[in-house]
């Protein structure tokens, strides 16, 4: 079993924001497999899908982004999953929109959800899929207002195409592992 943890903020006012791209990905995976989310045994929602004999539990923390580690630990404990069987999906302001980066481990890179997960697990050795949200020219204002802002129509087209590739990358990770997925999917959207 693999846990695919999409990061985001739980309130509906954050739907379709750049910061919630992790939720968007697990939502789209659940929809593609005809699954739906229900309450998990902790502060998260879960949906189960099966792909090529691999079971994936899609997880959406019901905590705010900066407390995501609580949900990750609860889901790992309940499903008896080790760090090498999780993939955390989040936004990345340092990557251009339309880009994804898979990593087997690493720092939080300024992403507060990843930071809390690293603190909660006591380790940075878990796979993550970062989805780029940076525009070529960043608009004036705070980074916070940008990441919590909704995608423009043009951005949404790019992100929808990127999410297709991300779904494929997640399924590749589940079947073949992080190294294989990294070799095949670390590129910009065409």
Swiss-Prot record:
The record marks 9 as: Discriminates between blocked and unblocked aminoacyl-tRNA. GO terms for molecular function: peptidyl-tRNA hydrolase activity; tRNA binding. The keyword Cytoplasm applies. The active site is at residue 19. GO terms for biological process: protein quality control for misfolded or incompletely synthesized proteins; rescue of stalled ribosome. Pfam families: Pept_tRNA_hydro. Transmembrane segments: none annotated. It catalyses: an N-acyl-L-alpha-aminoacyl-tRNA + H2O = an N-acyl-L-amino acid + a tRNA + H(+). Belongs to the PTH family. Monomer. Hydrolyzes ribosome-free peptidyl-tRNAs (with 1 or more amino acids incorporated), which drop off the ribosome during protein synthesis, or as a result of ribosome stalling. Catalyzes the release of premature peptidyl moieties from peptidyl-tRNA molecules trapped in stalled 50S ribosomal subunits, and thus maintains levels of free tRNAs and 50S ribosomes. This is Peptidyl-tRNA hydrolase. It comes from Chlorobium luteolum (strain DSM 273 / BCRC 81028 / 2530) (Pelodictyon luteolum). The gene is pth.
